[in-house]
């Protein structure tokens, strides 16, 4: 990392962290916002009509139509949050950072303005606004993940930190709920969020690149405000060429790097030509997307994510059932859940630190054995993948026990496992596949997992009345341990191959 650009890099890092923690993943604070919507009588007409027909007989069934509408909104929004990542990931890869961020700002601003001016009479507009909010938020995250490239060996830590900040941003809706209870209207809160778009625009042009942040980072790399007053286009093109050279050198086995100057030059030229051909064949987007490694990762993410979405979407109904309809207790537990979400930003970096430390350890071993950098990266992912599956399994087991006080432990396991899940997902795609396909692969894995997430709505009709769904999800999560096991076998096979070649 160049010391000259350090202040700019830190400014980009910190403002990106603020953007993710304050805006990107607010959708997942749905439980807190739902409490406000219910207080404002959104979708309450069907319930009132049912109550009149039943001669003032009230109970959980009276609110089912209202809960189903809210569940459907969250299902659609969470689906769009994931599914639209594929086309937006393509836009990010094809049209670069500035265009992607301007699209994100447009969707996000429109969504917050629509929510600000909704009421009980226009509650149907939430079916439009919440998906738009989700799409804008995920695009903020995608464009910020590349900031990890500025910090070299700390790359995984930064990526997981940003994913943790994405998780923590769900606490924003808790703040809106608390402000609402103090007399500040929902409209005022969302108008303030709309005005913040000015800050997003300023950051886009001053602290973010027009294109992509390369990895490895070339010397004298500049972007944003500095590129407008410093480096020229020719210098930036030279930096891109230098990045390609650095990337090709990283792929060289250690024993070939130590040969004589003339032989090394010839070998490098030959190997660069071979690598370009091999990378085109072996690392094409189609080849990556159809690989067993990618397919297993999609299954791993889809199952665990479905459980998280189902839990968030049904939490209000679950708490109402366990508390016997006590609104004060439901509010207290809703606040507790939202507060735990904020600590996702503190949990996620531990996963990144684990990956970075293991990667450094395996790199030292690779210098002795001649293992490829790809094998080293995969080895560093195995413990994180396994730990994420185990945490999610514990979360599912706690949630399946119908004891109100135990839900505090459930909330803690939920936030830790969720922050590990998305950090692990982004880091795995970054380390296990070529960086030029990251946007498309990240989008594809989220789009495919989004299709699976649509199951949460039919499951919602079962879960409040039965624990069978929780038990089934627990068994499915247990099976996700197959993914880290097969990645481990792949690493072992690569190590064996390297030792035989040596």
From Swiss-Prot:
Annotated membrane topology: Multi-pass membrane protein
Residue ranges of coiled coil: none
Cell location: Basolateral cell membrane
Record's compositionally biased regions (Basic and acidic residues): 237-258
Tissue-wise expression: High expression in the heart, followed by the lung, liver, spleen and kidney. Highly expressed in adipose tissue.
Keyword set includes Transport: yes
Ranges annotated as biased composition (Low complexity): 262-277
Pfam family, one: MFS_1
GO terms, biological process: hypoxanthine transport
Function: Sodium-independent purine-selective nucleobase transporter which mediates the equilibrative transport of extracellular purine nucleobases such as adenine, guanine and hypoxanthine. May regulate fatty acid (FA) transport in adipocytes, acting as a positive regulator of FA efflux and as a negative regulator of FA uptake.
Protein known as: Equilibrative nucleobase transporter 1
């Amino acid at each position: 990392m160049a010391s000259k650009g350090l202040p700019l890099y830190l400014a980009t890092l910190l403002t990106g962290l603020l953007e993710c923690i304050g805006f990107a993943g607010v959708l997942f604070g749905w439980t807190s916002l739902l409490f406000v919507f219910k207080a404002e009588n959104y979708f309450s007409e069907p319930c009132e009509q049912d109550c009149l027909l039943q001669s003032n007989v009230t109970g959980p069934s009276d609110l089912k139509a209202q809960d189903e509408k809210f569940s459907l909104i969250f299902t659609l929004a969470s689906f769009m949050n994931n599914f639209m990542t594929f086309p937006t990931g393509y836009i990010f890869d094809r049209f670069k950072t500035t265009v992607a961020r301007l699209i994100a700002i447009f969707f996000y601003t429109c969504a917050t303005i629509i929510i600000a001016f909704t009421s009980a009479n226009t509650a149907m507009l939430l079916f439009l606004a919440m998906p738009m909010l989700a799409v804008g938020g995920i695009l903020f995250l995608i464009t910020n993940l590349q900031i990890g490239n500025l910090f070299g060996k700390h790359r995984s830590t930064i990526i997981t930190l940003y994913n943790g900040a994405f998780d923590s941003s769900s606490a924003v809706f808790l703040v809106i709920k608390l402000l609402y209870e103090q007399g500040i209207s929902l409209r005022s809160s969302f108008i303030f969020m709309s005005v913040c778009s000015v800050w997003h625009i300023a950051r886009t042009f001053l602290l973010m690149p027009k294109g992509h942040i390369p990895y490895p980072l070339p010397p004298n790399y500049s972007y944003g405000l500095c590129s407008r007053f410093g480096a020229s286009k020719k210098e930036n093109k030279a930096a891109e060429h230098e990045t390609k050279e650095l990337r090709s050198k990283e792929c060289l086995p250690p024993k070939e790097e130590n040969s004589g100057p003339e032989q090394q030059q010839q070998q490098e030229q030959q190997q660069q030509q071979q690598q370009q051909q091999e990378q085109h064949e072996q690392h094409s987007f189609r080849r990556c997307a159809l690989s067993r490694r990618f397919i297993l990762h999609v299954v791993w993410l889809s199952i665990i994510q479905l459980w998280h979405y189902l839990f968030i979407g049904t939490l209000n109904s679950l708490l109402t059932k366990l508390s016997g309809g006590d609104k004060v207790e439901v509010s207290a537990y809703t606040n507790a859940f939202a507060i735990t979400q904020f600590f996702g930003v503190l949990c996620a970096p531990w996963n990144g630190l684990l990956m970075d430390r293991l990667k450094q350890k395996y790199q030292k071993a690779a210098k002795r054995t001649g293992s490829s950098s790809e094998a080293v990266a995969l080895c560093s992912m195995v413990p994180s993948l396994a730990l994420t599956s185990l945490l999610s399994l514990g979360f599912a087991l706690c949630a399946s026990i119908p004891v109100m006080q135990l839900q505090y432990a459930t909330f803690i396991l939920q936030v830790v496992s969720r922050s590990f899940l998305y950090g692990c997902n982004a880091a795995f795609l970054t380390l296990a596949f070529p960086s030029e396909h990251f946007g498309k692969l990240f989008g594809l894995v989220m789009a495919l997992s989004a299709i699976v997430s649509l199951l949460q709505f039919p499951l919602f009709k079962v879960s409040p009345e039965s624990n069978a769904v929780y038990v089934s999800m627990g068994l499915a999560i247990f099976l996700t341990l197959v993914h880290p096991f097969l990645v481990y076998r792949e690493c072992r096979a690569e190590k064996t191959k390297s030792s035989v070649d040596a």
